[in-house]
């Protein structure tokens, strides 16, 4: 989602906090589960402190990131639609877990909504960057309307509106005004990457790969009625087998859904079949499942594939790469921001050579491998990767170097994943209560991937 993690100012102070001690080997299974839940709640409390300390009180907009070093904290005091959407869902999560009161949650989100109502937009869609101090447009990196980022803001608005009915009028008006048809290419049946307002041009590329994080924007666009349902079937499960640039030649068959032929292709890793993402990263695969009921409704497709990606991520990192911890996904590095993934899981897989592991990838796996998550968190804690605002953004598991940074996006993914695990999928429930989340559910149910 973020192709670059922009140059940082001075780096800031490590403020460490003790991670709740992990459960002992002799406790009962139920006792371990209860203790692990307590640990996750304690982690979520620290994680949400990021949004408490780094959200502008006047505008309700969260900072993009902070870095820490040598007694200084360097905040990135601009934000994106994705950051705002994750802030809303994190705030709902914090209230559901019991970290903040309902009144505080409503107040926080309402302040932010008032800023969004006045913010500059294009066909109701939000630009990529705004200053947190006043909600004004930030144009340092252009004037871009991002399909995927608007999708995550829409998701956050939908969740907030369902969690707090008194905010629903505001959230619904904002979502209704977001016209995704302007980003849709009916000739191809796919969403464009976005629109450059300055040059008045759509991106040349489309979001053609199905199993990536933009599928949330696609789902919402269909749920709103901005684009036709056939769009869901026009995305590639794998690229056609004749496209020889992809990392594997896919196997599979053609299935017809709603009159559209879909090549149900798959790749294979150590005899495990899966539908690939673009880069093989955890957040491409599992971030959409924070709001979409893929596990519950897509048992023969997305839900099963999510489990395969978790299993292969763990196997690839620990066995093939020989790392002591797993969780390969784009993350901050000591000097920048880079893309990492389990290379075989991607059509054009990101590298895993840097040995950079990011904690948000661990939390995203909670629904599919809680025991492995517990063990991995303990390993990451042993690297010293836990501080005042929860887990730092990444650690080099070969050198032990911890990237002393926190990103709003990654903090948000961790918060929502924990809330869904502790509160039985509460964020997904709120999303699917809305007609936009409910209307396309049949698309999740009816498909069967060729990985069964």
Q: What do these predicted regions represent?
A:
Residues 1-4:
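Positively charged n-region of N-terminal signal peptides that target proteins for export
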Residues 26-452:
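Ser/Thr/Asn(+Pro)-rich, low-complexity disordered segments
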Residues 8-17:
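Bacterial N-terminal signal peptides
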Residues 17-28:
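Sec-dependent signal peptide cleavage junction
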């Amino acid at each position: 989602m973020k192709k670059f993690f922009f140059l940082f100012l001075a780096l800031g102070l490590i403020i460490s906090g003790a991670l709740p001690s992990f459960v002992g080997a002799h406790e009962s299974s139920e006792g371990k589960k209860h203790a692990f839940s307590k640990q996750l709640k304690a982690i979520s409390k620290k994680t949400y402190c990021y949004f408490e300390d780094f959200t502008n009180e006047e505008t309700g907009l969260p900072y993009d990131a902070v870095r820490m070093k040598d007694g200084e904290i360097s905040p990135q005091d601009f934000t994106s639609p994705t950051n705002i959407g994750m802030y809303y869902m994190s705030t709902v999560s914090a209230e559901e877990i019991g970290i903040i009161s309902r009144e505080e949650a409503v107040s926080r989100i309402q302040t932010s909504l008032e800023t969004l109502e006045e913010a500059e937009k294009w066909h109701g869609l939000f630009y990529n960057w705004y200053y947190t101090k006043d909600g004004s447009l930030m144009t340092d990196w252009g004037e871009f309307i991002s399909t995927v980022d608007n999708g995550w803001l829409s998701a956050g608005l939908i969740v907030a509106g369902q969690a707090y009915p008194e905010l629903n009028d505001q959230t619904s008006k904002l979502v209704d005004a977001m016209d995704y048809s302007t980003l849709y290419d009916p000739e191809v049946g796919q969403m464009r990457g976005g629109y450059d307002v300055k040059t008045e041009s759509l991106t040349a590329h489309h979001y053609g790969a199905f199993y990536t994080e933009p599928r949330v924007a696609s789902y919402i666009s269909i749920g709103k009625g901005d684009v036709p349902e056939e769009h869901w079937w026009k995305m590639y499960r794998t690229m056609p087998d004749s496209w020889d640039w992809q990392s594997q030649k896919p196997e599979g068959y053609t299935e017809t859904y709603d009159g559209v032929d879909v090549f149900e292709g798959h790749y294979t890793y150590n005899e495990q079949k899966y539908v690939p993402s673009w880069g093989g990263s955890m957040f491409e695969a599992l971030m959409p499942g924070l709001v979409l009921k893929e596990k519950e409704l897509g048992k023969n497709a997305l839900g099963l594939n999510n489990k395969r990606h978790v299993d292969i991520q763990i196997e690839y990192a620990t066995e093939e790469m020989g790392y002591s911890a797993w969780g390969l996904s784009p993350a901050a590095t000591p000097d920048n921001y880079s893309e990492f993934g389990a290379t075989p899981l991607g059509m054009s897989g990101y590298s895993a050579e840097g040995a950079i592991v990011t904690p948000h990838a661990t939390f995203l796996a909670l629904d599919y491998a809680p025991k492995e998550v517990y063990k991995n968190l303990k390993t990451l804690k042993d690297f010293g990767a836990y501080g005042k605002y929860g887990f730092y953004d990444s650690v080099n598991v070969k050198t032990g170097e911890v990237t002393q940074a926190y990103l709003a996006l990654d903090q948000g993914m961790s918060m929502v994943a924990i809330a869904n695990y502790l509160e039985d999928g509460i964020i997904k429930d709120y999303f699917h209560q809305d007609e936009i989340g409910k209307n396309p559910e049949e698309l999740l149910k009816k498909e069967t991937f060729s990985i069964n």
